[in-house]
């Protein structure tokens, strides 16, 4: 219910889809996403601003596809949507896309560059929906890349 005002249409599908995946109406959500990298002991650099409205498949379609072959899904299960990328470079959802396979490094706030994540980098993901002065925040997901043993 809380996200109802943030519903948006899914992108148009390039090819016909199976009947169990067909749906009508606004099934995606307009949720702003932000990803930052924070090198150890340094300030963070925001590297991506994306949005769940770019998801090619809605959450309902993803769940239907996941379970259609008999794979159970229960309360508390977690599944990943995959990379959420827009069409502009700053909306690309992976380091591989953002750096064009490591050929175009990202400039960090501290002046260093990143082609890929490095040991001790912290990745921070944030999400929120905002419309007409109403903001629903989802907080942060934070993880640090630890060196191999």
Protein language model annotation of sequence segments:
Residues 1-74, 84-149:
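Catalytic-core "active-site belt" of small-molecule-metabolizing enzymes
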